[in-house]
């Protein structure tokens, strides 16, 4: 039906007869001629209809925006005065000789001349995807997946599919359950990841596996989360954590070169403890130059009890955050930041403006200065490398709360004051995560990554004796404050796997019920293995410069896990439920999926 794409025509096609298919992007009548901008997935080209081509000209008079058409004509060079350097096809135009209207269009419910609400865009997603910026994002996504497949194939990895209907296993989030018609009362679970299957593939001898795969998690959504998402899933046998990281770093490095022509350089490696200490986050955004400084040793004996109490409690932190040029902040600004950190559990935010550092306590402005000595103030100024015109924020309290609150404040202030270099790329590896997280209230332990992660350099007995403080052989790749991938060395011995399950409070009977197949497989010569998974959607989001993951998925869900276009989820009919032996005891009253 066509010989070329609109956006791929150029001066090399001058004199050629071509046939194009696409949509009317815009129509205008000028000096007895009809001009249209014709659009397809590759771009836009100008088409003009001359009255001498009577039939085509007559049909062209009926054209309106978004009519779907076919045009045949001859490519010709535009006069120099009419060259449009803002268009990829701006040096040429198509002289139309025939026109077919495939389909007419009603007035669009989306207005291309103004910003449409996301709700409206998602309701008419098929129209939203016609927009060049949306089309370009999906094309980039396709380019990324093709690149990943070529890279992984070249490294000797095998693309192996794993099941979509599987067994519910505890992996952190809630499962999406699928009822079985044949086995009434039983349910499949949609996989949160192919984790156990890819480990079983290692046990089967497929020592290099990858898959670009859909995963499902029934969890609260954020701007960078979806209930169904895509992973680049990787697993290897007989490779160390360092070797896995080396291969994956090469892939991401090559991907950025291919898509953006950006050299990411070597990725620095930072421990979890260092990341939390310096940045208050296990996914630090290194584009922001500010760091958290622990000053507990400097304020243990001050009269300000908020500082002194926290400084003398090993479970607490006293943190200083120097803001370059921050002395210009108003009291209203500071109050707003104080309110901001309260979201993360902080009970307050102290501050100090540095007017003349050389004068010590006399050269600073702070509501807490009266509780501090000149020596303490000088020590704080030295520890934070403060200079005249800076402001120092302080937080004191429990370690977790302070890391979260001051880490979030660091990010917000960095953006607000334009201290963060938004044009830079700052990747790194974060390693040596805690094996377990301890609930501050109950003291119970949960796996920080998942229960199949191997500890570093511990026997099952040593891990059981001292689980708190154990370090996992785990690693995350972080780019510009986003965790784009995470992985670990896996447990490959039965005794260690049972020990981890027991520490997590999973009884032997529950272990057999939920993970019997895995425990059995670990008895038969399981090789050492390690892996990693990248969030494809998040990678595409970064590479296309958007901050909303819904912009890089063709048909995404809302933050309420609903599809506004199809009105999913929807009620099932009674016959279908009866066949599945399911009785609905409570229904959602509202059908509003917003």
Swiss-Prot record:
The lineage of its organism: Bacteria, Pseudomonadati, Pseudomonadota, Gammaproteobacteria, Enterobacterales. One of its GO terms (molecular function) is nucleic acid binding. It catalyses: tRNA(Asp) + L-aspartate + ATP = L-aspartyl-tRNA(Asp) + AMP + diphosphate. It is an enzyme of class 6 (ligase). PANTHER family: ASPARTATE--TRNA LIGASE, MITOCHONDRIAL (PTHR22594:SF5), ASPARTYL/LYSYL-TRNA SYNTHETASE (PTHR22594). Keywords: Aminoacyl-tRNA synthetase, ATP-binding, Cytoplasm, Ligase, Nucleotide-binding, Protein biosynthesis. GO terms for cellular component: cytoplasm. The keyword Secreted does not apply. This is Aspartate--tRNA ligase. Disulfide bonds: none annotated.
């Amino acid at each position: 039906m066509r010989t070329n794409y609109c956006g791929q025509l150029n001066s090399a096609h001058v004199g050629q007869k071509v046939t194009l298919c696409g949509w009317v992007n815009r129509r205008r009548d000028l000096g007895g001629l009809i001009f249209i901008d014709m659009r397809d997935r590759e771009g836009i080209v100008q088409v003009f209809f001359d009255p001498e081509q009577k039939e085509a000209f007559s049909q062209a008079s009926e054209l309106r925006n978004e009519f779907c058409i076919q045009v045949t004509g001859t490519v010709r060079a535009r006069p120099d005065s009419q060259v449009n350097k803002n268009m990829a096809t701006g040096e040429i135009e198509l002289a139309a000789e025939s026109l077919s209207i495939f389909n007419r269009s009603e007035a669009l419910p989306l207005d291309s001349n103004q910003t449409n609400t996301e709700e409206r865009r998602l309701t008419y997603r098929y129209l939203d995807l016609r927009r060049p910026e949306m089309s370009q994002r999906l094309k980039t996504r396709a380019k990324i997946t093709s690149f990943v497949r070529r890279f992984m194939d070249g490294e000797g990895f095998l693309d192996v599919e794993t099941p979509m209907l599987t067994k519910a296993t505890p992996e952190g989030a809630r499962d999406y359950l699928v009822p079985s018609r044949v086995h009434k009362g039983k349910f499949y679970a949609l996989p949160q990841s192919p984790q156990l299957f890819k480990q079983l593939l290692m046990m089967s001898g497929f020592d290099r596996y990858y898959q670009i795969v859909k995963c499902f998690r029934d969890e609260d959504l954020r701007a960078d989360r979806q209930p169904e998402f895509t992973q680049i899933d990787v697993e290897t046998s007989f490779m160390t954590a360092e070797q896995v990281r080396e291969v994956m770093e090469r892939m991401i490095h090559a991907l950025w070169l291919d898509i953006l022509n950006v050299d990411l350089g070597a990725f620095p490696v930072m421990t979890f403890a260092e990341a939390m200490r310096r940045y208050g986050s296990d996914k630090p955004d290194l584009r922001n130059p500010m760091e958290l400084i622990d000053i507990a040793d400097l304020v243990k004996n001050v009269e300000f009890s908020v500082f002194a109490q926290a400084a003398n409690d090993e479970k607490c932190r006293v943190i200083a955050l120097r803001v370059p040029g921050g002395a210009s902040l108003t009291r209203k600004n500071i109050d707003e930041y104080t309110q901001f950190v309260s979201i993360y559990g902080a009970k307050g935010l102290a501050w100090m403006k540095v007017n003349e550092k050389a004068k010590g306590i006399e050269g600073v402005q702070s509501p807490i200065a009266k509780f501090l000595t000149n020596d303490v103030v000088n020590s704080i100024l030295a520890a934070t490398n403060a200079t005249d015109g800076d402001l120092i924020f302080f937080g004191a309290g429990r370690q977790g709360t302070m890391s979260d609150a001051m880490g979030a404040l660091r990010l917000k202030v960095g953006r607000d004051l334009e201290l963060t270099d938004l044009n830079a790329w700052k990747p790194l590896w974060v390693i040596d995560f805690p094996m377990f997280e301890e609930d501050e209230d109950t003291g119970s332990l949960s796996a920080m990554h998942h229960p199949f992660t191997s500890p570093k350099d511990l026997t099952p007995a040593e891990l059981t004796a001292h689980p708190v403080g154990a370090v996992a052989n785990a690693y995350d790749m972080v780019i510009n404050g986003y965790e784009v991938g995470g992985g670990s060395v896996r447990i490959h011995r039965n005794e260690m796997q049972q020990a981890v399950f027991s520490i997590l409070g999973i009884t032997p009977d529950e272990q057999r019920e939920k993970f019997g197949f895995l425990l059995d497989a670990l008895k038969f010569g399981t090789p050492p293995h390690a892996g990693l998974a990248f969030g494809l959607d998040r990678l595409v989001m970064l590479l296309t410069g958007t901050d909303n993951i819904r912009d890089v998925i063709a048909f995404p869900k809302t933050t309420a896990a609903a599809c506004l276009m199809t009105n999913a989820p929807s009620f099932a009919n009674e016959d279908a439920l009866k066949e599945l032996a399911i009785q609905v005891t409570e229904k959602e009253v509202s059908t509003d999926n917003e």
